[in-house]
């Protein structure tokens, strides 16, 4: 070795590469109440032991890099490093492990979901020593969650604003999602709201296209809201999508919505980004607007069981970033979602305190302290025959959203809305009388058809529609 490259052991530094597990695998570590805890599903490359793989995840998502560096000596790695503190095999898998990592709180900027994800999932998912990696869950300590505003208003404030209690709320996504003029779009909203729905909704990709500019849509939808409110005596809303190409444009659209006096706006939080979403959530709280969140792009991230990030993590992140509603799947409709797993992250959205429950995919006990809850939105391929199951699964604090299940009614939009409202009221009344919706649901709907011709027509149209596919992402048995 030449004098120029010789390591000077006397100064406490030894150049070269050493196994991650020597520094970052610490099974003796006792987690702190202030640590952010992560559960990763790790699939190492052949020949890589799980301890090395778990330690590599901890290192590359915190203070580590591929080689020893001089500047390690200028800080306290013991204070700042992530630690892989526990590893367990995945049931039924030969080469998968759940690796638990603890991160010191000081690694993260206060009130920034963007920074949290940049650290925990920003770089390590491309690591060559791993065949696949999935973030299954996070434990967010109150010391960190209290640095976030969270939802602009929350469930109770929304009910008070709408003056609607004791039942799920009803919505409808306007279809076709693209191509309607602003006036025809507003007319469709009016018919649905007049027929009995609480909300209508922009689809996720309705922004400001040549066939319908955002300002025109906002004006005609506001007209629909005010006209339907005057006729029904109920407070109505339309999720006006404020998502835009820049944060400045997004806020401009939200400001215009507020000037129109509408109750709620909408954002695509994954395609729009967490920084934009948190900005909009702060504006909505300051200005009395509810915020509906669409999860467009989520399945790119969360659908595959072995790689990516589970939706329960995205749901927790949304609760911190801010939103009053978020789409959560339906269990019974056309979109992915196993029942117990869906109920697990629905509780993480709504409840203050959620116990660890691996049977529902919840890896950590989560205490949200006083952070407001988020209403889950069941949307995607649902119709009146699903109403008993949806009411039983999601309960009162939910939005049940029927797009094609409203607009596809043979008699038109308003009868479609009336059919859904009658079906919902029948299910809520039956539940309150002590009847079993899971067992008696079809009977309850058939009985309601006798005094609602709109519901009878809807039941006839969709009597044979089913989406019988097994979910891709399931709980480990």
Curated annotation (Swiss-Prot):
EC identifiers of the protein: 4.1.1.39
Compartment annotation: Plastid, Chloroplast
Positions of the record's site feature: Not N6-methylated: 14
Protein role: RuBisCO catalyzes two reactions: the carboxylation of D-ribulose 1,5-bisphosphate, the primary event in carbon dioxide fixation, as well as the oxidative fragmentation of the pentose substrate in the photorespiration process. Both reactions occur simultaneously and in competition at the same active site.
GO molecular function: magnesium ion binding; monooxygenase activity; ribulose-bisphosphate carboxylase activity
Residues bearing PTM N-acetylproline: 3
Positions of the pro-segment in this chain: 1-2
Recorded name of the encoding gene: rbcL
Similarity annotation: Belongs to the RuBisCO large chain family. Type I subfamily.
PANTHER family: RIBULOSE BISPHOSPHATE CARBOXYLASE, RIBULOSE BISPHOSPHATE CARBOXYLASE LARGE CHAIN
Gene3D superfamilies (alphabetical): Ribulose bisphosphate carboxylase, large subunit, C-terminal domain, RuBisCO large subunit, N-terminal domain
N6-carboxylysine PTM sites in chain numbering: 201
Organism: Triticum aestivum
Protein name from the UniProt record: Ribulose bisphosphate carboxylase large chain
Catalysed reactions listed for this entry: 2 (2R)-3-phosphoglycerate + 2 H(+) = D-ribulose 1,5-bisphosphate + CO2 + H2O; D-ribulose 1,5-bisphosphate + O2 = 2-phosphoglycolate + (2R)-3-phosphoglycerate + 2 H(+)
Cellular component, GO annotation: chloroplast
Subunit: Heterohexadecamer of 8 large chains and 8 small chains; disulfide-linked. The disulfide link is formed within the large subunit homodimers.
Alphabetical list of Pfam families matching this protein: RuBisCO_large, RuBisCO_large_N
Top-level division of the source organism's lineage: Eukaryota
């Amino acid at each position: 070795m030449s004098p120029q490259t010789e390591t000077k052991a006397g100064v406490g530094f030894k150049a070269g590469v050493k196994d991650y597990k020597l520094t970052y695998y610490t099974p003796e570590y006792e987690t702190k109440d202030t640590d952010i805890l992560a559960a990763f599903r790790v699939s190492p490359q052949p020949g890589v032991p799980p301890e090395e793989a778990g330690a590599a995840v901890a290192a590359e998502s915190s203070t580590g890099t591929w080689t020893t560096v001089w500047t390690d000596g200028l800080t306290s790695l013991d204070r700042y490093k992530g630690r892989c503190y526990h590893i367990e095999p995945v049931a039924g898998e030969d080469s998968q492990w759940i690796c638990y990592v603890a991160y010191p709180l000081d690694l993260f900027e206060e009130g920034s979901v963007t920074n949290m994800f940049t650290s925990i999932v920003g770089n390590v998912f491309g690591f060559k020593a791993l065949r696949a990696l999935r973030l299954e869950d996070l434990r967010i300590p109150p010391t960190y969650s209290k640095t976030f505003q969270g939802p602009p208003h929350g469930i109770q404030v929304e009910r008070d604003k709408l003056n609607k209690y004791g039942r799920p709320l009803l919505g409808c996504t306007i279809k076709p999602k693209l191509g309607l003029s602003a006036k025809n779009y507003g007319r469709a909203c009016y018919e649905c709201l007049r027929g009995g729905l609480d909300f209508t909704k922009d689809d996720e990709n309705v922004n400001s296209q040549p066939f319908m500019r955002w300002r025109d849509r906002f004006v005609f939808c506001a007209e629909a809201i005010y006209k339907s409110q005057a006729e029904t005596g109920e407070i109505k809303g339309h999720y006006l999508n404020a998502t835009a190409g820049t944060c400045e444009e997004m806020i401009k659209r939200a400001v215009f919505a507020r000037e129109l006096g509408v109750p709620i706006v909408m954002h695509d939080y994954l395609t729009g980004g967490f920084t934009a979403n948190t900005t909009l959530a702060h504006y909505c709280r300051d200005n009395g607007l509810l915020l509906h969140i669409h999860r467009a792009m989520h399945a790119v991230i969360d659908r595959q069981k072995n790689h990516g990030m589970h939706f329960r993590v995205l749901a927790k992140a949304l609760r911190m970033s801010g939103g009053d509603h978020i789409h959560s799947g339906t269990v019974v409709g056309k979109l992915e979602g196993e029942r117990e797993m869906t109920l697990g992250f629905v509780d993480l959205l709504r409840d203050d305190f959620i116990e660890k429950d691996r049977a529902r995919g919840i890896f950590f006990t989560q205490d949200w302290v006083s952070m407001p809850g988020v209403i889950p939105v069941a949307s995607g391929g649902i119709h009146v025959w699903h109403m008993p199951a949806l009411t039983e699964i999601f309960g009162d604090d939910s939005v049940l959203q029927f797009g094609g299940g409203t607009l596809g009614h043979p008699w038109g939009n308003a009868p479609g809305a009336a059919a859904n409202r009658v079906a919902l009221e029948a299910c809520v009344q039956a539940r309150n009388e002590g009847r079993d919706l899971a067992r008696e649901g079809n009977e309850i709907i058939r009985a309601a058809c006798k005094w609602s011709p709109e519901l009878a027509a809807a039941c006839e149209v969709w009597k044979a529609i089913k989406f019988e596919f097994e979910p891709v992402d399931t709980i480990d048995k």
